[in-house]
């Protein structure tokens, strides 16, 4: 009896690292597949660290049939939930909640773009944009700051126009879509 228990203990020790690797892979599949599944429809930009991890996870999934099935099922469930929300008129709320819940992996694409542009302008431009678009306290602009201010403002207007056209084309709520763009913009401004 002791011999059998010893053999079982040895076998369990041999398979423990494999089980641990499978658990790690499963956790990564559960984390990344829904995010990547909604990149296009929710207009998400994945951060660099998550993008690298996702590529590594995809390579590992190719050799593990159980992980592959899980990835497929999660993608299907995520897309189904999105379609249900979209068809129920809740697309923006669904995407907003999803991005908030997965903020460690991704953010709204427009928020990421605005953050990139804001890092190149002065703080007075950032404060003026925050005041005029997001309701922050007033700020003064120097003559040199008007051009970058106008460029960022034009970028916002262009994104809002695009959101409006997409909403009209797809039969979505125009006000909700353009408001979401403004909220994404203000989220980037507030992180500064």
In which residue ranges do the predicted regions lie?
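Positively charged n-region of N-terminal signal peptides that target proteins for export
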Residues: 1-4
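Hydrophobic helical h-region of N-terminal Sec-dependent signal peptides
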Residues: 6-15
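Secretory pathway export signals and precursors
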Residues: 9, 38, 89-91, 129-130, ...
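Immediate post-signal-peptide N-terminus of mature secreted/exported proteins
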Residues: 20-52, 112, 117-139
